[in-house]
Curated annotation (Swiss-Prot):
Gene3D superfamilies: Glutamine synthetase, N-terminal domain, Glutamine synthetase/guanido kinase, catalytic domain. One of its GO terms (molecular function) is glutamine synthetase activity. It comes from Debaryomyces hansenii (strain ATCC 36239 / CBS 767 / BCRC 21394 / JCM 1990 / NBRC 0083 / IGC 2968) (Yeast). This is Glutamine synthetase. Residues 40-69 are annotated as: Disordered. InterPro entries: Gln_synt_N, Gln_synt_N_sf, Gln_synth/guanido_kin_cat_dom, Gln_synth_cat_dom, Gln_synth_gly_rich_site, Gln_synth_N_conserv_site, Glutamine_Synthetase.
Amino acid sequence: MVSITEQTAILAKYLDLSQNGKVLAEYVWIDADGNSRSKCKTLDKKPSSVEDLPEWNFDGSSTGQAPGHDSDVYLRPVAFYADPFRKGDNIIVLTECWNNDGTPNKFNHRHESAKLMKAHADEEVWFGLEQEYTLFDQFDQPYAWPKGGFPAPQGPYYCGVGTGKVYARDLIEAHYRACLHAGVDISGINAEVMPSQWEFQVGPCEGIQMGDELWIARYLLQRVAEEFGVKVSFHPKPLKGEWNGAGCHTNVSTKSMRLPGGMKSIEVALSKLAKRHKEHMLLYGADNDQRLTGRHETASIEGFSSGVANRGASVRIPRSVAKEGYGYFEDRRPASNIDPYLVTGIMVETICGSIPDADMFKEYARESSD
């Protein structure tokens, strides 16, 4: 049997072949389970803008996005990035899913979120997302954990250095470079509290770009992990017991929050978030109740709380922000498996105001509609 490393080496010589002027465009979309899917299309030339990219389609009955008797779902390009795998002029295309009647597919939450971002563009809302995830081997065991046993308790792994303290750094470094090559605004990485758990940060990004960049960063992570024979889990509590869960802490600021005296705007935003806690929690990721227990650096899912430098609160205000009197806040409630369009959308809706033609709670509920 050929090893994964050998397969990659074999592939390399074919990637050096001429494409005779053609460009490969990998179309990426989000399926019914919140996973990324993709397929490739040949273009005659490199596009200069997203408007140059053709609409495409796929079999939605095979992804849980359409019934078999009416299975065509259409892919509308919304952004494209340099392809770090094929390199050259090849690209990765992020798309929205649309039904054949011209309506957004019920798992396309970008469309609704974009309405809110556009309506509140003057607020200049910035986001930064901290994506945590856990690595597993091909047999669904935590990557590099002792066979049939457990590693030492949590403590030495967070931002750890050295054998036995960090695992799969090569994969993480490869993903970091892939994001930078693609043009994703990745701002950092670190090993997390549980062994074989990592985090990358994307942002700050303004408006709808935040969701776009996180989805592409996730896609790139899954693709890189393929080459290492490693599985990536975004489950918020992949292992029961005395192990940290995985979140997607959401850092938020508006223009007024970033100006001197902005703490007043932050306090107003927190009071609005407190009033919609239950609604937000429904959009903050499946199985999040397993993570938000009030332990392992989380708040309880049952109520809203906030505090300065408090990682056991629903929302944390960094100490530097409290000292300077302006900046941003960190919503620690979102789970690692969120749809960032839902989370950033309801955040803007809550702190900036609702608009007549967009409702993120109803948008989320569309997933359960017939």
